[in-house]
Amino acid sequence: MISRLTVLGKEYNVQYLSETELPDRLGETYTEQSLIKIRSGQSKFDEADTLLHECIHALDERFQLNLTERQVYCTTVGLLCLFKDNPDMLQYISSVIDKREV
């Protein structure tokens, strides 16, 4: 499980909470508190889906894009399908980013 993420230079803590603690949603993002909450007990795939979904919310808020929930959902599903259909893609992107001079 991931406990910390950096989104556009801002560090977020990631908390995993029970269904009792997070009853109405699978995840939530609190930009001002630098916090992402994920409901525990999901399958690994669903947990990854929720984490990516909340990261897109964090990007949306940082860029002030004002995405709708549907746009965030569709972007999440699209990226997950892209990664599933192209399993070498994440490794390739990561290797290119690691070698890039900033």
Give short role names for the model-derived ranges.
Residues D49-E61:
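Active-site recognition of the HExxH zinc-binding catalytic motif
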